[in-house]
Amino acid sequence: MAQRVCIIGAGVVGLATAYALVREGFDVTLVEARERGGLETSYANGGQLSYRYVAPLADSGVPAQALGWLLRNDAPLRLRPRLDPAQWRWLLGFLAACRGSLNRRNAAHLLRLALLSQRTLQDWREEDGLDGFDWRRNGKLVAFRQPASFARARQGLADPSAQFVLTAAECLALEPALSAAPFVGGIHTPDEEVADCHAFCVQLAERLQASGHCRQLHGRRVTKIVEGGAAVRGVEVGGDLIEADHVVLAAGYRSAELMLPGLRLPLYPLKGYSLTLPVGAQHRAPDTSITDYDRKIVYARIGERLRIAAMVDIVGFDPGLEPARLALLRQQARDTFPQGGDFDAAVEWAGMRPATPTGVPLVGNGGYRNLWLNLGHGALGFTLACGSGRLLAEQIGRRPPSIDTTGLLPRGALAG
């Protein structure tokens, strides 16, 4: 008889975990508070599958920059201090992670997981015929406005054999739509990819339904993880107990509400925003994915749409749209790609990205014998989802992991 796994949360990480587990022979129950999966942080994110450019937000240059950003209305990072111990714990952990040695170590952890994720998605596409989510291998160009930031990036390439330094003229030759922006150079990674994260969630949910080994409960909120000694028995949903041999917590930033006594998740939501523009024959949208490094804006051509995403707001738990931030994003995007799409028809969105202070997700055991975590991916949720799901399925199935798991669930990370 197949072992039963209950997964809390049907965003891209939860769905990818369910898919990996079903492929390994488990029976899965997926519980999602919304009416279907992929409607929260996975709905309209940046769309870039950025496997080799995975540097954590916690960087040695950020503390000094942040002091200047606090005084600017157009800053890519905004902090609104609150009387919230969780926010201050997270900020202190973030500052500690900005040390250069820790940043490099955490970037190495992320790169291992990202490359596994790329291989895993390729396996699923080739072996299972998974498609229908506007996937393309279109490459990525990280473009720089400031000579100093360009110089630092050239010195810290994650994979010099797969990344290429370009002059301003070479950037323009690669992507002619950049003609309106004063970039001084860029770093090109040809094998990066792009896709529609929400459509990917829909495809995974349909495949899981067709498998006969995944029960999906939508519009149902888990109110409690039920413990029993050194293990957990299952989850409580609407007063009913759903028993399981294993429980996976993948509910994004809301996961902290469900942690058991004595355990605390080092998570905080980083609010981000996106615009999605229709692209017609009269427009000049970039075909290559673009990251405007100095403004911290990403651009991704997803089918006949241009997705523009940006900003890190550490402002609490309100997921609502903020007109001033969206107006700033619209203005900066129009300055960079004035003919990039129909700005008047842009669809606005905001999402709450669950992040750890280090930027490295928590993928592994959650302090009880059969409680597992897959969360804290920050802005890299789509990029890391398939690899994280595969890695957790291997751990639950007691199989040798595909990569070294060092750093993915550090000792003491869950201390209450």
Curated annotation (Swiss-Prot):
Claim: Flavoprotein is one of the keywords in the record: yes
Domain of life assignment: Bacteria
Protein name: D-amino acid dehydrogenase 2
Cited InterPro entries: DadA, FAD-dep_OxRdtase, FAD/NAD-bd_sf
GO molecular function: D-amino-acid dehydrogenase activity
Species of provenance: Pseudomonas aeruginosa (strain ATCC 15692 / DSM 22644 / CIP 104116 / JCM 14847 / LMG 12228 / 1C / PRS 101 / PAO1)
Gene name for this UniProt entry: dadA2
Similarity section: Belongs to the DadA oxidoreductase family.
EC nos: 1.4.99.-
Taxonomic placement: Bacteria, Pseudomonadati, Pseudomonadota, Gammaproteobacteria, Pseudomonadales
